[in-house]
Amino acid sequence: MGGAVVDEGPTGVKAPDGGWGWAVLFGCFVITGFSYAFPKAVSVFFKELIQEFGIGYSDTAWISSILLAMLYGTGPLCSVCVNRFGCRPVMLVGGLFASLGMVAASFCRSIIQVYLTTGVITGLGLALNFQPSLIMLNRYFSKRRPMANGLAAAGSPVFLCALSPLGQLLQDRYGWRGGFLILGGLLLNCCVCAALMRPLVVTAQPGSGPPRPSRRLLDLSVFRDRGFVLYAVAASVMVLGLFVPPVFVVSYAKDLGVPDTKAAFLLTILGFIDIFARPAAGFVAGLGKVRPYSVYLFSFSMFFNGLADLAGSTAGDYGGLVVFCIFFGISYGMVGALQFEVLMAIVGTHKFSSAIGLVLLMEAVAVLVGPPSGGKLLDATHVYMYVFILAGAEVLTSSLILLLGNFFCIRKKPKEPQPEVAAAEEEKLHKPPADSGVDLREVEHFLKAEPEKNGEVVHTPETSV
């Protein structure tokens, strides 16, 4: 579970670890930024939407919730589309959907229409871009894959820092309708990123074996892998509490009497630390002595994040919350950089498209349950400390599930023979005895000349399909 898989892609092409892969990395950086930052960035338009439609804040908050639910919950659908049509066509269609949803939303006359356009259509478009971009990134990088994943993950905080001020500027100058229209045009850049996702093509070589059978559209055999099951369970529990502190930290500061401007600056601190934490975590995970133990590093990052939540629950002033945001940003960045690297190390490239879709589907339920459950607890107790303790306990539990499960269930699997030994034994088994005196050409002629025997078809390399 903790070992790194040598990525030779579904076509058998060795990952180039550079070259055009840097263009793919840039595209993945942009797509990751749009996918994770966009649901948060649209929140700057909520006040105008409340005034326009005469609704409450909880009604507008459903826009971001639906966006995230589509991003996570459509994982299996994305997996099926990628396995059927390939990454680039799916991303091109997704880019059009993402743009179309925001453009259509600018003409909406009710909040329900905004849910359907911005939430469902744009959310589906972002999902059709996010998952294929990660698949392509992990096909292009093998040795440098941890670093590549870390750099791509940095797109989330970078775009969040850029899109939120941009959204505010657009709202002030053009209103929410004009802002949605311009953001819809901006999302067409997803199609540009899709064009960068050039598939790796293998050239047919003489003497090569028969073509590989087509893969399943959704490979459920990943559930037979104990490592994948442990990862999926741990990730789902982690997501229950992972996104709760960023949602409530600003309100927590205001409850302590901190001015609105200083309270909002806490998210800027968190995002700034996150920008540097993700590439740094990817670099560390790619070190030769660390990479085989990437699953333990991922467990540590979750444990660190849970401890930060528990420490943040004791903050009694603005300085304490600043310290919390610094340590939370470090641990949050580590989790973001390592989560898909560890999943790739568990299942390999050939099953990654199905595995990531299934994991995102399981996480979708947790995303919808986590922040609302924190809000319910806050409504019942009116104490932010309990919310942070709950979030920290959930993330700590997930780290222990992954750590103990990997140590006791995965490490004790029987060791497989070394590749060199296995190859030598295979050669010995297939090598004919020295004194057999059998002419191999006669045997080959016999197999070709007698395709049927006793009513049964003998499948030779020439007759097999």
Swiss-Prot record:
GO MF annotation: an example: pyruvate transmembrane transporter activity
Ranges in the Cytoplasmic compartment? 2-17, 83-84, 131-149, 201-227, 286-294, 339-351, 406-465
Q: What is the effect of changing residue 198 to Q?
A: Does not affect lactate transmembrane transporter activity
Catalytic reactions on record: (S)-lactate(in) + H(+)(in) = (S)-lactate(out) + H(+)(out); pyruvate(out) + H(+)(out) = pyruvate(in) + H(+)(in)
- Please state what the protein is called: Monocarboxylate transporter 4
**What does the record's free text say on domains?**
Two basolateral sorting signals (BSS) in its C-terminal cytoplasmic tail are required to direct SLC16A3 to the basolateral membrane.
Which consequence is recorded for altering residue 425 to A? Affects subcellular localization leading to apical localization. Affects subcellular localization leading to apical localization
Q: How does it assemble?
A: Interacts with BSG; interaction mediates SLC16A3 targeting to the plasma membrane.
What is the protein's known function? Proton-dependent transporter of monocarboxylates such as L-lactate and pyruvate. Plays a predominant role in L-lactate efflux from highly glycolytic cells.
GO BP, one example? plasma membrane lactate transport
Q: Where is this region: Basolateral sorting signal?
A: 423-441, 441-465
Kindly give the CDD domains that the UniProt entry links to this protein: MFS_MCT3_4
Residues with the modification Phosphoserine, per the entry, are: 436, 464
